[in-house]
Amino acid sequence: MDILQIVILALIQGLTEFLPVSSSAHLILPSQLLGWSDQGLAFDVAVHAGTLIAVLVYYRGTLRTLLSGAFGRREAAHLSLDGGQGIDRSDADSQLHTATASKDVITARDAWREIMCLVVATIPVMLLGLLFATAIDTYFRGLNTIAYATLGFGLLLGVAYRFRGADGDEQPITRLDHALTIGLAQALALIPGTSRSGVTITAASFLGYNIATSARFSFLLSIPVISGALLLMLATQSDAMAGDAILEILAAMSIAGLSAYLTIAFFVGLVKRIGMMPFVVYRVLLAALLFAII
């Protein structure tokens, strides 16, 4: 791969991994319009590793709060919906009182509930991915499928936001039945063009959560999903990585990671200002472009 190809594809992966617009729908465009060949396993591993590092770094405070709340801490812990670093409960009793009175408080019980929700929501996509990965690669990788999924799930996102997600609940997702529903929806993202973040935000919105809560859960949910995808790629196709240039891999990882981090950082604030409908319109236009290419 030349440097231009690395930069463009890594940027596409990083920018679209956490936006509700389908990374696969965008990654197929260069190959169709510019005749680029498949980027190879090493590149896929690099960009996925970059996006995983991005979400881990951005939500490091939230993850630390969840884990400290779940293991051995009796007092309430502050959990910011936007991925902030939280408040050290040992600083002052007044801080604890203030945080406890806020809506962004998580107890040890709630920390365990949210961790369990993330686990439950991960199970469907892991199981179905292991069982049907080959079939999906064989029958659902075509441009037709990507175009229809981009359009259909984009319109569904618009319906969810219009009728449920704009003014929904802002509390963290701690109901296991809701987590399972979101997890089942996430499994649909195995179909290229669906958008993992898009379909999970859609499901959470239909369940009555607002965009900030839906996006936060979706982004946290990406951690086990991307980790699992990386492990699967390495376990089944590691021989394909032999001889790849380390500088190309590091460049792809860095570009994808930085662009993914910036996307996460700006997404919720952007949606609060412009809503989700611009993303819906964008998906419709993207689908139209894909249909025109077919």
Question: Can you describe what each PLM-predicted range is?
Answer:
Residues 1-294:
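Multi-pass membrane proteins that catalyze or facilitate reactions on polyprenyl-/lipid-phosphate substrates
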